[in-house]
Amino acid sequence: MRVLAVVLAAAFSVAAAAPPVVLAERGNPPACTIVTRADASACERYAAQELQRFLKRQTNVELPLATDAEPLPDHAILLGATRYSAGILGATNAVAALGDEGFRLKAVPPHVLVLGGSGRGPLYGVYELLERFGGCAWYSLRFEVVPELKAFSVPADLDETQRPTFELRSENWNGHGRADDFAARNKLNLESFGEKLGGTRFRFDPVLGKCHTFARLVPPEKWFDTHPEYFSLVAGHRLRNHSQLCLTNPDVLRICTEEVMRRIAESYPKGIRYYGVSPNDWQNACECPACAEVDRRAKSRAGTLIAFVNRIAEEVEKTYPDVFIQTLAYSYTRRPPVGIVPRRNVQVCLCTIECDFSKSIPESRAIENRRVRHDFGVWGRSGCSLSVWDYASDFGAYHHIWPNYGALRGNLEFFEQQGVRQVFTLVNGGGPNEVWSNIRCWLLAKWMWNPRLDEKALLDRCFKDHFGPAADDVWEYFNLLRDAPRDTKRFPMGCFSNVYGPGLDETVLVRASAILARAEARVKGTQYAENAHLARIPVDFTRVLRGAARPSLSRKDRDLAKWLDERDAARRLVGIMDRPDGLSLCDDLAGRTAFTARIRALATKETPEKPGRLRLTLDETHLTGSYPATVFRYVEDPQARDGKAILLPGKAGACTAWLDFQSLDLDADGLYIPRIRVRASPCGRDVLPFRAGVYNRIFRRVVNSFGPDAIDIQMGVEKYRWYTLGVVSPRMGDTLWIGLGDAGDPNAAAPDVWIDRVEIVRIQ
């Protein structure tokens, strides 16, 4: 027995020591031939070309391409289900269980098989080979890692099968959502994928797209004048502007069904199978008796929506059984209705816009996360087709420190547990120079494929690729932000957070800045210097906006060393902003203008402002806009002091300009009087031309409201006039707002409002 054990041990040792299969070796002739089926799909042929291209970049060896119509080479990399694959494996039907995107990597020396169906499986398998054994990585359109190698080899015992967790994996960050080849290298699959990349089953109609389609189905400009009953009844009025549809009106159902069927007839032959029927991107659900009764019984305003969409889907299914009608569980329709279950061909897209993103949905203590957990669970148990529209940026300020890394993987695991099969993540970002957004999107792509991939292993690789010898410094920075205390129960980290609001403590920001300065110094003059420099953007941006860039009415001297440090940060930001590809600072024009003006103003200063000023005058660039930000704009105005003003168009309905008091350096115990220089377009004497007040954005309540009596608003006066508001003692979250007035009729446009400037006067 002892002799047998020794022999077996020796045999296992020999097997374990089997030499790797060499695919290409620098300085030698090609070791392998890449073989595809003679009738290979365009995607399989592209997979072969990608493997050939990257192996040549890595080893300077160009492997020949062949098909299985030719004799099997002595050493082959077989892509897809070639006629030789089953024989080499000793198994038939080797790819059936892999689906369109799954793959199996199998070494059978001297051959290597990359198995997959005729879809993207072989292509994804090629990228896995290149990442795993070649050290390749594609982080952004401008930063990829393709190491030069002496030899490219794979283990002789390689045998691994992978299938994606989600059938649709999409995000819209630079490259991932706008360059198909790049997205495919990260195992994403986009609606735009053409034949070369395996096409897609998930294309949406170009008119009835993913979201907010009511106004396209029943345009108010076409129907409201003759049929106001088609539109939502709110507070006793049918609304033309910012309206939804009356979903219990049979004519609305007929018109929508006809339009959906017309769109399907036009786009179905092009391979489109998804059509959106969903509310517009605001509130104002219909409150008519019929709609109110359906929603009352369903205990949710999604009751009328799902019942309505079910009726359309039922009609569609008769002719197009493979078509899906998608609608939104978003805002007021997120709560699942009681007793109304979506049909088989209805897809419900769940949205996470209200969440706290400092932690994953299951982990966060924020009240909205608890509600989302409940709602997702009920939708999941309904058995309907589920997709998710997730959010992974701070849209209020793209470069604000917003450490949502603790939510990325956990949320995807949560979505999988609820039965979600399709995920789209909105990751609008600050431009290609934003290293941290690139890293965030790379992580998302990895976890959309497999949310169980180890975070530390991924980040280790990512930080070493980006920062080289400074990787440990960046780990220290990353852990500092992740572990820093935050009161997310009271102040959740939402996706429209306030750069001036409660968040990371100033001591954390100072320490973070010092760590990244050390990292940049460590790699100065190396290939990693640019990434280390760009990695400082979020800390610099947050410190500048919360610190020295704030106009001051304080009685206290500024800390000179701190001021100089923040001034240097502003100069670093301006250096990046002035590049051709620059930085996109915010989701809307007003925010971009305000942030840009303050950063540039600080960068040009030589000394801080002297304390003790009694009056602070701010031009229009210091104001930001609230939703809908697209209608808030800057205009030439000869009546304004500097010839420019903010225009709030009356037809916009809800457009408002804001000045966050935390964007100013004010004393905590100070008393101040805000004044505004405003004019409005001609209006009747019974029309309120504008409103103003103070609103707390953290606690979501009105602090002061300055009406006509309080501020002596003159009706119908077109010239600028200063209006003095009440005394305020601003607290965290307090914000001065100036908004449109009231025409007395919800369907009549309010007067246009021009805002020239704001003045803050210190009285104590």
Language-model-detected regions and their locations in the chain:
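Feature activates predominantly on carbohydrate-active enzymes
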Residues: 47-50, 54, 93-307, 314-321, ...
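Catalytic domains of carbohydrate-active enzymes that cleave complex glycans
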Residues: 444-668, 672-674, 682-684, 688
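Extracellular carbohydrate recognition and processing domains
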Residues: 697-733
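Structured mid-domain segments that build the active-site/substrate or prosthetic-cofactor binding neighborhood
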Residues: 247-254, 262, 267, 367-470, ...
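Acidic, contiguous N-terminal accessory segments
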Residues: 9, 15-104, 152-159
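Beta-strand acidic-aromatic groove motif in beta-rich domains, primarily in extracellular
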Residues: 681-700
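Short beta-strand-plus-loop segments that form exposed binding edges in beta-rich domains
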Residues: 739-749
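Substrate-binding cleft/loops of secretory-pathway carbohydrate-active enzymes
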Residues: 326-354, 400-404, 432-441
